[in-house]
Amino acid sequence: MKRRQAELFGALGENYGALPEGFVFQPDFISSDEERALLEEIARLPLEAAKYKQYTARRRIAYFGFGYDFTANRLGAAPPAPAFLGPLRDKVAAWMSLAPAALEQALVTEYRPGTPLGWHRDAPDFGRVAGVSLGGWARMRLRRYPRGKDTPIVLELAPRSAYQMQGAARWQWQHSMLPTRMLRYSITFRTRERS
């Protein structure tokens, strides 16, 4: 337990204990063997440049279950998730106390060195969100939305760590990624938000 607390304190630095309500962070969510197997499979995926309206990002992505059309601001069709994502989806769903089928979208993202991700909240068509980090480290920032005067929280996402967002963390906070220093991948799972 003390090792886990030390890892979390190191991940948050001076912001220890400052995570928003509904944000859960877990170091070493998967093993190095699981990470290696996932990276081998991801290397075979046909990743494409991420597009946001008329902007082409430096990230490369592959959507499964549902895509998202940022020009039309709506969900789009995407192929079913490949079999290799099944065990990870099951593990994430159990951690979130959900049935695996509730995680209807999977997104694989490649961050090459120097790739950022700007401030945003995930599209409102989605509900709960979980992400698993692979490869390199990342620095995730969190800030209230609408933006207040608080200093953003910075969280170090180590390889093999995971986070989940629901409630206030999902709807009342934005997140971003600082430019990566080394090649990194993330696998994001999302539930659908049904009104």
Located regions from the model:
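Non-heme Fe(II) oxygenase metal-center motifs and adjacent flexible, charged/small-residue loops
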Residues: 1-195
